[in-house]
Amino acid sequence: MDNVRIGIVGLGNIGQIHVNNLLEGKVERGVLTAVADAFPDKLPEYEAKGLKTFDSGEALIASGEIDALMIATPHFQHTTLGIAALEVGLHVMVEKPISAHKADAERLVAAAEARPELTFSGMFQMRVEPRYQKIRELVQGGELGDLIRVIWIMTDWFRAEAYYQSSDWR
């Protein structure tokens, strides 16, 4: 099978993690070829790694340099970038949440459904953890009965105020 040329738009915290995972060969058949970010001062670091760089997601999408796009931008950009990528025939993986509003999520999903030959996914990494798999098994197996409401409080995922101050969109 051929390798998939991947581009990443958004080089903040999670975007950098995706870059490193791809450059370290942790994604079978995935080859990072290009990145985009709205802050041009970030781009020389990636050019030095041999990647093509773009100053906007739209430019990356139109470049012809990639087969698939990973979207790691602020939430409010997920819908427009995802739809634009799908419309030109790119596979799309978008960070959570897939959109900032329900109506936008529905538009993005509809765009993906209109292109069944493409792969579209949202990054919800917790779904593969054993504890969440067990809960899914219990719910789907009916062992908990008919659920009307679930209140779930996670107390092991603390973020200091500095995290929220690190970007004006958080």
Identify the function of each model-found stretch.
Residues 57-64:
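Short amphipathic alpha-helix with an adjacent loop that forms part of the alpha/beta core around
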Residues 2-4, 118, 148:
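Nucleotide donor/acceptor-binding cores
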Residues 51-57:
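Conserved SAM-binding strand-loop segment of SAM-dependent methyltransferases
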Residues 126-170:
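Predominantly a Rossmann-like dinucleotide-binding segment in NAD(P)-dependent oxidoreductases
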Residues 68, 74-75, 79-127, 142:
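Beta-strand-loop-alpha-helix segment that lines the small-molecule cofactor/substrate pocket
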Residues 35, 69, 150:
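Receiver (REC) domain switch-region micro-motif
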Residues 1-49:
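N-terminal Rossmann-like dinucleotide-binding module
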